[in-house]
Amino acid sequence: VIYGQSQGQSHKGFFSEPNDKPTSGLIVIHEWWGLNEDIHLMNEQLAGLGYSSLAVDLYEGKSATKVKDAFQLSTNLSNNEQRALDNIKQAYDYLKNEVGVEKIGIIGWCLGGKWSLRGALMLPRDIDATVIYYGSLIEDKERLATLEMPIIGFVGTKDRLHKQFIQFDQDLKDLNKDASIHFYQG
């Protein structure tokens, strides 16, 4: 599905609808490999749970199977953060205005977890829930204070981001946010 456009380039993603009337919408953000078959399958599973799910393509048609290629794609993305944020905003607008869902959450894994949080920070009064699977975080408490939605995060205790998640959890507690960060052994 084409859900938006910026700088003359269409934003294309993978859209999945539930069999029944959707309960809510989800912006689904891929890990650093790109919008691949794994994300398509996850998007379908989320639709099976009742969500209108839009898996965005932050790499604009590219994907990787090798670490060096994924690293290059993620670096290029980080060098053009505004374009990525525009992409997420247009996904939100598509779900809200074209699909017609009232509540919209955002979920991402790894690189997608990073952008899930950034999308929530961009739309702190519009996003209704944020899910972060082991993505790099924002450590600025002033920015985190703007978040108004429930936040859930997941990270392994041996993950390189483990300590960052401990601080993130404490910051959210200090700010009295509705947040639940889960730490898994391994």
For the regions a language model picked out, list residue spans one by one.
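Short beta-strand/loop motif that positions the catalytic acidic residue
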Residues: L147, G153-V155
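A short beta-to-alpha transition loop/helix N-cap that caps and shapes the active-site region
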Residues: G61-K66, L137-R143, L161-H162
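Active-site-adjacent alpha-helix of alpha/beta-hydrolase-fold enzymes
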Residues: Q45-A47, T157-G186
